[in-house]
Regions:
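Phosphate-binding loop of NTP-binding sites
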Residues: 1
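Active-site glycine/GP-rich loop and adjacent strand/helix microenvironment
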Residues: 4-193
Length: 193
């Protein structure tokens, strides 16, 4: 899950300021100010609704900060298209790009975007799209509902159908366009309340 992955990154960083700042914007803001003053290279990973809450409370301008959003809104806020979300975050943090992670609890692998909203997969992960009305019509290029094959899932199901709408490009990269209407709220970030 996202929480497990980030916890592992925190432990591996061994930096004294690495940690979870769940709903503690005051401490996070103080930590970021300190790291900025020390010119410490910093990665801030947050769920979309949490990062929005943070910058709407008070913007924090740090052009050298690397910000990675993940997890979507999970029903906690109005769904935004990725471009709108990223524009708000860019302005709120004073950065030129917002990185993104696309993954889910059922998968061992993730796809990453380096600021342009276009996700790339590792070689053992493939994304297909199906027709919204007929999930048996799969294709490797075009728009539709995203389906993921993750060969890293050795001892579990290595293929899933999501309720995410997307578009796959000729090179296998893809964009997430939103959710299927009336789809379930889901995600590991809902585990923490």
């Amino acid at each position: 899950s996202l929480v497990y992955m980030v916890d592992d990154l925190i432990k591996k960083s061994t930096h004294s300021k690495s940690g979870f700042y769940l709903n503690n914007h005051k401490e996070l803001r103080a930590t970021l100010k300190e790291l900025k003053s020390q010119k410490q290279k910093t990665l801030l990973i947050g769920v979309s609704f949490g990062l929005l809450d943070f910058v709407e409370e008070q913007s924090f301008q740090w052009p050298e900060l690397t910000v990675m959003e993940t997890g979507g809104m999970k029903g906690r806020r109005k769904e935004l298209i990725r471009e709108e979300l990223q524009q708000i975050l860019k302005e709120g943090f004073g950065v030129e790009e917002i990185h993104s992670e696309y993954g889910m609890t059922e998968l061992l692998s993730q796809a990453y975007s380096h600021g342009d909203g276009v996700f790339t997969c590792p070689p053992w992960m493939k994304v297909l799209v199906s027709d919204e009305d007929d999930p048996t019509l799969l294709k490797s290029i075009g728009r539709g509902v995203l389906h993921i094959i993750d060969l890293a899932n050795i001892y579990s199901c290595s293929f899933i159908a999501t309720q995410d709408l997307g578009e796959i490009n000729e090179d296998g990269s893809f964009q997430v366009l939103g959710r299927v209407d009336a789809s379930d709220r889901r995600g590991c970030s809902l585990m923490v309340v």
